A protein has these predicted regions:
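Long, well-ordered, tryptophan-enriched scaffold segments
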Residues: 1-63, 68
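Internal maturation/activation junctions in enzymes
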Residues: 5-9, 24, 36, 84-197, ...
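Structural recognition of the beta-strand scaffold that forms the well-ordered cores
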Residues: 55-57, 62-65, 74, 183-184, ...
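M16/insulysin-pitrilysin zinc metalloprotease superfamily fold
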Residues: 72-88
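Conserved catalytic alpha/beta cores of large enzymes that bind or transform nucleotide phosphates
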Residues: 102, 216, 221-222
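A short, polar/charged loop-to-alpha-helix boundary motif
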Residues: 201-218
Length: 222
C-alpha cells in the first residue's frame, strides 16, 4: 500500500489490518475465548469522533471536560456545587475546605453512577446536571460537620435515563484492586502526576499481538 499510494495509503492499510483484518480477528477471538463482549462488528465499525467538550466556568476560569461517555463531567459538576461556597475564606486544606470538596465530589460521583453513559446509546441530561438550578438543589445535601458515609442518592435530573434504570441499591463495599494514583512535588516545584493502574493483572497481553486490552475493556470478562 505504501508503494502504490504513499504514506496515506499505508496508514489506511494499517488501520484496516487492526480494525478489520488479522489483528482484529486475533483480538476478537481472545475476547470471545475469555467470555468477553467485544465483537468483529465492534472493531470494524469503530470510528474516532470529534466532538465539542463540555464547558463551564468556576471563579472566572473556563473549564473544559470530556463528555459523559467517561467520568469527565464529574469535575465540572463538583465545581458547580462548590461555586456556592467561599473556599478562599475557608482556608486552603482546612477541615472545612476538605469537607466541602469531598462532599461535592460524592454528590457528583453519585450522579455519575446514575446518569452517565455514551450519548450515542443513552440520553444523558447533561444540561440539567450542569445547571446552576440543579447544583443549588444538590448543594442542600452538603451539611456542615456531617459527612455522607457512602455515596449519597443521585439527584432527580429528569426521567430520560431514570425511567430505564432500577432504583440505586446500597451495600457493603467490596475490597478490590482499584485505580492507583501517584503525585509527587519536590522542593523545587517540579511535579510528577501519574495514574499507573491501567495496565495490571487484569490486562493480559493478547497472544501474538503484544497488545493488551485496557482495564475498562477487560471488565467485560474479569
Amino acid at each position: 500500500a505504501t508503494t502504490k499510494g504513499g504514506r496515506a495509503a499505508g496508514l489506511k492499510a494499517a488501520r484496516a489490518a487492526f480494525y478489520s483484518g488479522d489483528i482484529a480477528a486475533t483480538i476478537v477471538k481472545y475476547h470471545r475465548d475469555n467470555g468477553g463482549l467485544l465483537s468483529a462488528d465492534d472493531m470494524s465499525q469503530f470510528r474516532v469522533r470529534f466532538e465539542k467538550p463540555l464547558r463551564t466556568t468556576y471563579a472566572g476560569v473556563e473549564l473544559y471536560a470530556c463528555g459523559p461517555w467517561c467520568q469527565g463531567p464529574v469535575l465540572p459538576q463538583a465545581l458547580s456545587l462548590l461555586a456556592g461556597y467561599d473556599l478562599r475564606a475557608a482556608g486552603h486544606n482546612t477541615p472545612e475546605y476538605i469537607h466541602l470538596v469531598i462532599e461535592a465530589l460524592k454528590l457528583a460521583f453519585a450522579d455519575r453512577h446514575r446518569y452517565y453513559g455514551d450519548p450515542n446509546f443513552v440520553n444523558v441530561p447533561m444540561d440539567t446536571l450542569l445547571s446552576p438550578e440543579y447544583a443549588a438543589r444538590r448543594r442542600q445535601m452538603i451539611r456542615s460537620g456531617e459527612a455522607w458515609p457512602e455515596l449519597p442518592p443521585a439527584g432527580n435530573a429528569g426521567d430520560a435515563v431514570q425511567a430505564k434504570l432500577p432504583d440505586p441499591t446500597r451495600g457493603e463495599p467490596v475490597p478490590a484492586a482499584d485505580t492507583s494514583y501517584v503525585c509527587v512535588i519536590d522542593r523545587f516545584g517540579n511535579g510528577f502526576s501519574a495514574t499507573p493502574s491501567d495496565a495490571s493483572s487484569e490486562t493480559p497481553v493478547i497472544p501474538g499481538t503484544g497488545l493488551c486490552p485496557s482495564s475498562r475493556g477487560s471488565q467485560s470478562w474479569c
